[in-house]
A protein has these predicted regions:
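C-terminal binding/interaction regions
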Residues: 17-19, 23-24, 102-163
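Short, Lys/Arg-enriched N-terminal segments with co-localized hydrophobic residues
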Residues: 3-13
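Glycine-rich phosphate/diphosphate-binding loop of Rossmann-like nucleotide-binding domains
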Residues: 18-38, 42
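A short beta-strand-loop structural module common to alpha/beta enzyme folds
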Residues: 41-52
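Helix-adjacent hinge/juxtasegments
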Residues: 58-98
């Protein structure tokens, strides 16, 4: 997994993949310096302007890297977050969570060990989005009974995604 020696998040280096479509561009640009301030190195995989693009083309970039273990976590942003959620959750080992509030942010990590955070750029305001990201990054997976539930999801993945 890539590491950067110049950044530190909670005492360890972390890179996080970041991508959006045109509906999430403004929020993505707002989150990049915020992530750096938290000590996280954002790996920006586009889009790079507000021209209309297809969200699957950008969701796949992050989901593939997280699925393969090349990135530990990712953040995807589109207008509502729904499209990016649909794309990301097509990949094995991806637990993408569409989050619009702080409670869901915490629970997506604590209970579901979400590895991709999805935000609706036209739904969530910039300041709330920053709080959501901070809570999401700072919340560890609780394990315990939640681990057993994730193991059931992993078993379903293995059974249903054999091809």
């Amino acid at each position: 997994m890539p590491r950067s020696s110049s950044k530190s998040f909670q005492g360890r280096s972390m890179q996080i993949g970041l991508a959006c479509d045109h509906g999430g561009f403004e929020l993505k640009e707002e989150l990049k310096p915020f992530l750096k301030m938290l000590g996280v190195e954002p790996i920006d995989m586009g889009t790079f302007n507000e021209d209309s693009v297809d969200y699957p083309d950008f969701g796949v970039l992050i989901a593939e890297k997280v699925s393969r273990g090349e990135l530990e976590k990712g953040i995807l942003i589109c207008g509502t977050g729904i499209g990016m959620s649909m794309v990301a959750n097509k990949f094995p080992r991806i637990r993408a969570a569409l989050v619009n509030d702080l409670y869901s942010s915490r629970c997506s990590r604590e209970h579901n060990d979400a590895n991709i955070l999805i935000i609706g750029g036209r739904i969530v305001g910039k300041e709330l989005a920053k709080e959501i990201v901070k809570v999401w990054l700072e919340t560890p997976f609780a394990g315990g009974r939640h681990k057993k539930r994730l193991e059931k999801i992993e078993a379903l993945e293995k059974e249903k995604f054999k091809g």
